[in-house]
Amino acid sequence: MKISQIEKKKHLYLIKLDNGDSLTVTEDTIVTFMLSKHMVIDSQQWEDIKSFAQFSYGKSKALGFIAFQQRSQKQVQDYLLKHQISPDLIPSIIDSLKQGKWIDDQQYVDTYIRQNSLTGDKGPLLLKQKLMLKGIASQLIEPVLAQTDFSSIAQKAAEKIYQKYQHKLPSKALTDKIIQGLLNKGFSYDLAKGIVSQLSLEQDSQHIEDLLDQEFDKLLRKYSRRYDGYQLKQKLYQALYRKGYDSDDITTKLNDYF
């Protein structure tokens, strides 16, 4: 067999043989086999070229995927499968990328956690969950988490929640909101409690009274359509207490109204 034509197609090349066969290959395939027009090849060479072309194309797709953003090994594997690269070729493509340091799950973990320390707000539990969803083994994650101080990250996250709700919630509800917010972000309960204890959550009595008045009026409109008398009073008390208002303050408010 003889190569009758080599035609460039964007980033790939179309190779045509004189027997009518054709194959689209990467530039790496051209260079590796030193392919040129009029070159004579046998059937075994042609099979080798086709096999390498598939490998090279898959590797090229993977390199494009990781060119501008670091990826885990599983992310690259999933990407190749999605783009219909043969499952039989993927292990060799991954090995080649790992040898070239294009894929390194340990480095991925280090970078991910370091970036969170600089600009993120996630705790260790959430970080571990997200990294494991990317296919990274826990034994690569846990040592890095153990060496990371999360107190300053939790502090910033707590202050952000505080700023959002300080004018909307009474002290107890605000405390619960901050702790729950930190738990949702993957921080431990002990750390969340410790961080909250360092915050100044005291509110002046007038502010608390204003909040209570607003919440009372809103709940009164809601419950007065269905309840009255003692039942209404009980519903209001329970709802206000659940929202974190002090029992004595609620009782005073209810006695003033009823």
From Swiss-Prot:
PANTHER family: REGULATORY PROTEIN RECX FAMILY PROTEIN. Belongs to the RecX family. It comes from Streptococcus equi subsp. equi (strain 4047). Signal peptide: none annotated. It comes from the Bacteria. This is Regulatory protein RecX. Coiled coil: none annotated. One of its GO terms (biological process) is regulation of DNA repair. The keyword Cytoplasm applies. Keywords: Cytoplasm. The keyword Lyase does not apply. The gene is recX. It is found in: Cytoplasm. Modulates RecA activity. GO terms for cellular component: cytoplasm. Pfam families: RecX_HTH1, RecX_HTH2, RecX_HTH3. Its main location: cytoplasm.
